[in-house]
UniProtKB/Swiss-Prot annotation:
Residues 696-780, 826-904 form the POLO box domain. This is Probable serine/threonine-protein kinase PLK. ATP binds at residues 169-177, 192. The active site is at residue 286. Residues 19-66, 121-143, 463-554, 601-638, 798-819, 908-978 are annotated as: Disordered. Residues 19-36, 54-64, 473-492, 500-549, 913-978 have a biased composition (Low complexity). It comes from the Eukaryota. Its EC number is 2.7.11.1.
Length: 978
């Protein structure tokens, strides 16, 4: 090939002639004499010797034709250049062109290889990605959630329940799984969606019905909970419990193999679930790592698509299962299969978790089946597993079903009994092996010590009660096979009611063993069990083993849950579960009474101190009882003697707590009257300090823009007055809360006792959650901590009231320990006005906080406590304040008039009721000019779920007894409704 210049043009005369004529003209110059050709060169020296242009076109073509040496095609005539040079030039030209073509081909091939590599990498990434993140088909994963409606029919009427289909979780052979949110309750499920197009065959429909029937009948802590199912025109929806930590298969992919203690932790829970299924005559037939879901680090067995219920004498012959986990008798199919196929699968799971891969796994399914039939597997050198682990795997993977151990024998094996099983595993173990310190902290005791199966001659308590007598009889008949030990363990099904009778018959023999179990499993509850409350008719002594009495004293709700106890297979689990239900029935009462144990001890100490000081106080009490105010002196009559005592000396004694010691705790609900009777110097016009046992609001925060008012009382209670007029109050570091919900047309406050650690109905649970947030807000505040912890040191403000936590009971039940008689003090109503905010407590105490940061507390009809911003606290009679400072007198008059009428009005309670403005100024008599307030602490930030409290100067301040001063919590001089 030759390269032709783009500007090359043929002569016009040549272009217009046919090709044959042009060829003839090309040959004619070769036949002309040499002389003529030489004459042509004389005229045009620039042309080569073998080219003779036409005379007619020479002038015109010379400017349009550009010929290079590489373009010229020479005829076979003699030339001046040697022939080898011409060939070399042509070869070089051809080589250049060939080299260019090769480069282009190489570039194209490289591009193709890069594209193929990218495609392979994308495919590998998609295969390695977990199911929730893998998106095999974008068309099946819409960006916006799909709305699904369920039609609910009630008689002739019907309504639609709305669900929102969310994230794709995974898929199986016939269904896909998505997140599904119920719009009405905002509850999230894992929805298994089966298209109706796959249910056209009768066999497919019957399998789905069987799965729904079996799964909906199950209830076990290690089985995925069946919630609900419905259908529409396109799909069938099965709503299941959502497990938040994927499956054991995901752990296997990330970690390959687990430690033995981790394997025991998971396999033990799998056995519990399978034992429950077998006792209900159900075979799972698809046990594998992908069907072992994890929720809060607990195993949940799922996917009952291949499960079947076995009737009396029936052996299934359907070939089904996952190739790596399928049992040899399913492949043989001559004699059918039964419960032993699940035992085989447990052995495969055990091997896979310890070794890192299934024992019979190959690249070809047929070869895998052949190895299963021939029982060809081995243990690799690494990872190293114990002799106990190998021994258990070998015994389970026995090709003869009848020679495999049953579930009870598996748990009795040395693999489970020679070393402890962890109580729980950390979440980090999903991706990495737990540290040794974490292992040591979470280790329990060996299974043999927990169950006493080995040490107590195998007590044969491993089974559970079957649903029906016929099914239970069949399950026992199935176990009557050649291996007698295998039969006996399965035949001994456990029924708690029968077991109670057996326990009573053998009570003398097993008394010590039962005591050991109770002691081992209830060490954390010894403090609770040392009480014996006659009202509950239950003895909590550790030596009590009368299970009949324990069962009889269970609440109806706990007796309904007895089936859950029947589904456990070990003696210690039954006793512990039964004991736990007892404790749950009485936990609220125990916690309430335990709150006041320390309080009662402190009361006894106070009484002893009072007895010691009684002799010293007798004379002073006689002085107070016979006091007669005469100007600046007090005349006291004792027999025939008259003693004149200066008021200043008496005030000094009172201020130094020589007289005003804490009185015994009252059992009367009328707090102000009891205070008046118990206070030694109440017959005086006034005294310095707070009244004993007075409960007042020490701090509060405003959340009324969404929720309500939160507050802290001086007795360490935290409460809330919600915008819907419901109230709740709880003691700091307590699990008990008192919820007041007034019912229309009824008397009383509708009080309920709640356990904040348990779940409640939606509306009540919202209030419990809020009080937890309020409690956290106050307890994390430095100011609040000072307010709460001053009881032991401040005699003039709290008087050790922290120990006297609402020890008020009904007069008619003074000696009763029933928790219903304990009446916590709480905010009954509150209103704001221009100069401050007023509260009415449930004990009829009225407290008013003013903008000038002073407080007035009316604890009874005649006793008033004035707390200035700076200065000494004064408690006196109403007459004393009426005859004193006019500004204070005007405030008290306003409290007894307008505020009292509004706080005690029978109209619907309104927290935003405005009152007329009361004009006044800060009384100068109680101001202290020399001292300044403490620096302001930073306001505690709340969680994002709650709004920040609006700041107000009416918030209470910490009083320091040795320094006549308050510590501000919020200094702003403008009140915002709190």
């Amino acid at each position: 090939m030759v390269s032709i210049n783009q500007n090359f043009k043929l002569p016009i005369s040549m272009n217009s002639q046919p090709i044959q004529i042009q060829q003839q003209q090309f040959k004619q110059p070769q036949q002309q004499p040499q002389q003529k050709s030489n004459s042509c060169f004389s005229d045009q020296e620039n042309y080569p010797a073998n080219i003779q242009p036409s005379s007619s076109t020479s002038s015109s073509s010379s400017s349009s034709i550009h010929i290079t040496k590489s373009m010229v095609i020479r005829p076979p005539l003699e030339s001046n250049q040697p022939q080898p040079q011409q060939q070399q030039q042509q070869q070089q030209t051809l080589q250049q062109i060939h080299h260019q073509q090769v480069q282009l081909q190489q570039q194209q091939s490289l591009q193709m290889q890069q594209q193929q590599l990218q495609q392979q990498q994308q495919q590998q990434q998609q295969q390695q990605m977990p199911p929730p993140q893998s998106l095999p088909n974008k068309s099946n994963e819409p960006q916006e959630p799909i709305v699904v409606y369920e039609t609910i029919r009630s008689g002739d009427s019907k309504r639609l329940k709305e669900y929102r289909q969310g994230e794709f979780l995974g898929k199986g052979g016939f269904a896909k799984c998505y997140l599904m949110t119920e719009v009405e309750t905002n509850r999230i499920y894992a929805a298994k969606i089966i298209p109706k197009s796959t249910l056209q065959k009768t066999r497919a429909r019957s399998k789905l019905k069987s799965e729904i029937k079996i799964h909906s009948s199950l209830s076990h802590e290690n089985i995925v909970k069946f919630e609900h199912c419905f259908e529409n025109e396109e799909n069938v929806y099965i709503l299941l419990e959502l497990c938040n930590q994927k499956t054991v298969m995901d752990i296997h992919k990330k970690r390959k193999y687990l430690m033995e203690y981790e394997t025991k932790y998971y396999v033990y829970q799998v056995i519990m679930a399978v034992q429950y299924l077998h006792n209900n005559n159900i075979i799972h037939r698809d046990l594998k790592l992908g069907n072992l879901f994890i929720d809060n680090m607990r195993i949940k067995l799922g996917d009952f698509g291949l499960s079947t219920k076995v009737e009396h004498g029936e052996r299934k012959k359907t070939i089904c299962g996952t190739p790596n986990y399928i049992a040899p008798e399913i492949l043989d199919n001559s004699n059918g299969h039964s419960y032993e196929v699940d035992v085989w699968s447990i052995g495969i799971i055990l091997y896979t978790l310890l070794i890192g891969k299934p024992p019979f796994e190959t690249s070809d399914v047929k070869h895998t089946y052949q190895r299963i039939k021939q029982n060809q597997y081995s243990f690799p050198d690494e990872p190293i597993i114990s002799h106990y682990g190998k021994s258990l795997i070998i015994s389970i993977l026995n090709p003869v079903p009848e020679q495999r151990p049953n579930l009870t024998q598996i748990l009795e094996h040395d693999f489970f009994t020679y070393s402890p099983i962890p109580k729980y595993l950390p979440v980090s173990s999903l991706t990495t092996a737990p540290s040794q310190s974490t292992i040591n902290q979470n280790m329990g005791r060996p299974l043999s010590e927990k169950t006493n199966i080995v040490n107590q001659q195998h007590l044969q308590l491993a089974g559970t009660t079957s649903p029906t007598k016929n099914n239970n009889h069949h399950y026992q008949q199935y176990q009557q096979q050649p291996q007698q030990q295998y039969n006996n363990n399965y035949q001994q099904s456990f029924s708690p009611k029968k077991q109670i009778n057996n326990m009573n018959n053998n009570n003398n023999n097993n008394n010590n063993n039962n005591n050991n179990n109770n002691n081992n499993n209830n060490n954390n509850n010894n403090n609770l069990k040392q009480y014996n409350y006659s009202n509950n008719n239950i003895n909590y002594n550790n030596n009590n083993n009368n299970i009949n009495n324990q069962f009889a004293n269970l609440s109806p709700n706990s007796q309904q849950k007895l089936s859950e106890v029947e589904n456990d297979d070990f003696h210690y689990r039954k006793l512990r579960r039964l004991e736990k239900m007892k404790e749950n029935d009485l936990k609220t009462q125990l916690l309430i009474k335990q709150q006041y144990t320390n309080m009662n001890e402190n009361q006894q100490q106070q009484q002893q101190q009072q007895q010691q000081q009684q002799q010293q106080q007798q004379q002073q009490q006689r002085v107070n009882n016979n006091i007669n105010n005469n100007g600046n002196t007090v005349t006291v009559t004792t027999g025939n003697n008259t003693v004149n005592v200066q008021i200043k000396e008496l005030e000094t004694k009172i201020a130094n707590n020589h007289i005003s010691d804490s009185p015994p705790v009252s059992s009367n609900n009328n707090y102000p009257q009891q205070i008046q009777k118990q206070q030694p110097n109440f017959n005086n016009e006034f005294y310095l300090g707070m009244p004993n046992n007075l409960v007042y609001i020490s701090q509060y925060a405003d959340f009324t823009n969404k929720y309500g008012l939160a507050y802290v009382l001086s007795n360490s209670y935290v409460g809330a007055y919600f915008n819907d007029s419901t109230k709740i109050v709880t003691l700091i570091e307590s699990e008990i809360a008192y919820y007041m919900e007034h019912a229309k047309g009824t008397d009383g406050d509708g009080r309920r006792v709640l356990n904040v650690t348990q779940q409640h109905p939606h509306d009540t649970q919202k209030k419990v959650t809020l009080i937890k947030y309020f409690l956290n807000h106050f307890t994390n505040s430095d100011t609040t901590n000072l307010l709460i912890n001053t009881g032991a040191t401040s005699s003039s403000i709290n008087n050790n009231n922290n120990n006297n936590v609402e020890n008020v009971t009904n007069n008619n039940n003074n000696n009763s320990n029933n928790s219903s008689n304990i009446n916590p003090i709480y905010v009954k109503k509150w209103i704001k006005f221009d100069n401050g905010i007023a509260f009415r407590l449930s004990d009829k105490t009225i407290q008013v906080n003013y903008l000038d940061k002073s407080r007035i507390i009316v604890s009874s009809k005649d006793m008033v406590t004035f707390v200035p911003y700076r200065g000494q606290i004064i408690t006196g009679t109403l007459n004393y304040f009426k005859n004193g400072d006019k500004k204070i007198s005007e405030k008290i008059k306003y409290i007894y008039g307008t505020l009292s009428n509004n706080l005690y009005s029978k109209k619907p309670e309104s927290s935003f009721q405005q009152l007329p403005q009361q004009q006044y100024q800060q009384p100068q008599h109680y101001q202290q000019q020399t001292q300044q307030p403490q620096p302001q602490p930073q306001q505690q930030q709340l969680p994002q779920q709650l709004p920040q409290p609006q700041q107000s100067p009416a918030k209470q301040h910490q009083y320091q007894p040795n320094q006549i001063q308050y510590q501000q919590s919020i200094p702003q001089p403008q009140l915002i409704n709190q």
